[in-house]
Curated annotation (Swiss-Prot):
InterPro entries: NA-bd_OB-fold (IPR012340), Primosome_PriB/ssb (IPR000424), ssDNA-bd (IPR011344). Homotetramer. Keywords: DNA-binding. It comes from the Bacteria. Residues 1-103 form the SSB domain. The lineage of its organism: Bacteria, Bacillati, Mycoplasmatota, Mycoplasmoidales, Mycoplasmoidaceae. It comes from Mycoplasma pneumoniae (strain ATCC 29342 / M129 / Subtype 1). One of its GO terms (molecular function) is single-stranded DNA binding. One of its GO terms (cellular component) is nucleoid. One of its GO terms (biological process) is DNA replication. This is Single-stranded DNA-binding protein.
């Protein structure tokens, strides 16, 4: 099972992504505090979202608290192209299926499959949930279409700098 649950604050404005088929995406860094209680270290996690989830993410600002549910994925980082000895490296990221603002009741509304089971840690099980309540609790993202991505990245160096600080 590949599921990730994160809570943290946006490190900087989300970067807008767009595929050749005009699918909208967003990538951002989430600053998460170590919850083990042993230290106060932060981890900066790269997160990518697609479709309606990305449209919602693009409205967020640095410092906004969000809850992210998704899955781990790898992505290829091309090193300097002018260096013939440079090899591609791979890194982990989270592909966000759901993004919630804990301080907003209607942070994201999307269609929901009626067969969805309520398993959110933030909602008590409710047998008479309305369609709108289910849609708010369990947004469904569009298929990941991360091929042929034309990223509009202007904050990746900032992400690396933040990761080195801690």
């Amino acid at each position: 099972m590949n599921r990730v649950f994160l809570f943290g604050k946006l490190s900087f404005d989300p970067n807008k992504l767009q595929t050749r088929t005009n699918n909208i995406g967003a990538s951002f860094s989430l600053a998460c505090i170590d919850s083990s209680g042993f230290n106060d270290s932060k981890s900066y996690i790269r997160i990518t979202a697609w479709g309606k989830v990305a449209s919602f993410v693009l409205t967020l600002k640095p410092g906004d608290s969000v809850f992210v549910e998704g899955r781990l994925s790898t992505y290829k980082m091309n090193n300097r192209s002018d260096d013939p000895n440079s090899k591609a490296t791979y890194a982990l990221q989270v592909i966000a299926d759901k993004v919630y603002r804990p301080d907003e009741e209607n942070s994201l509304e999307q269609p929901v499959d009626k067969a969805t089971v309520i398993d959110s840690p933030f909602l008590a099980a409710k047998t008479n949930a309305t369609e709108n309540e289910l849609a708010q609790a369990f947004p469904i993202s569009l298929d990941d279409e991360d091929d042929d991505i034309n990223p509009i990245l202007n904050n990746d160096s900032q992400l690396e700098e933040e990761s080195d600080d801690e």
